[in-house]
Amino acid sequence: GPANIRRRVGWQHAERAGADALVVRSVGSDIRRFPHTGMMSSDSDGEWAEIPVIAVSNPDADHIRRLHELGEDINFTIRSTAGWRGEVVSGNVVLDIIGRETPEEIVLIGGHLDSWDLGTGAVDDGAGVAITVAAAELIARLPQRPRRTIRVVMFGAEEVGLLGARAYAAQHAGEV
C-alpha cells in the first residue's frame, strides 16, 4: 500500500532534500518495539540510497512525534550493520499431484518460503504455506486423484521482488 511505497522510495526524496538519514515509521501494527522490516527500491537509474534508512516501531514513532510537538530538539545516533551482502541462491519447491483425466491441465496453489528478519514468518507466509500444504495433503488422500494436475509451489525470494514466482512464470510460460 501507500505506506510501503513511502518506505521503498522515501530515501530518494530525503536525499534530494539534503537529509543525512531517513527514519521511517513502521508500517506494522506491533505494539512492541519491533519495527516492521522491508526492502527499499532503487531509483530509476538503478542507484540505491547513500544515506542510512531505518525503521522505528510505532511506540517509538509516537514518542518522537510527541517530542516534536513539544518543540524538543530531536537528535539521532544511528548504528546499523545492515547492508548488501551479495547475491545468494534461492529456489522453489514444487510438488505435482498428477491428474487422472487431463494431467496436462495444471491447477497451481502455493505460498512463499521467505520472511523478514524480525518476523517469525508465521503470518507472512508460514500460514499460507501451512494451508497450501494441508490442502495438498487432503487432495492426495482423496479416494481418487483429481481430474487435473494439482501443482503445489513454494516460492523462494518473494520478499525481495517475487523472484521465485517470476522465475517460475518465465520457465513455465508455455503452460499458462
Question: What is the meaning of each model-derived region?
Answer:
Residues 25, 110-112, 153-155:
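Generic beta-strand/beta-sheet core signal
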Residues 40-122, 134-137, 141-147, 170:
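Soluble metallo-hydrolase cores and metallopeptidase-like ectodomains found primarily
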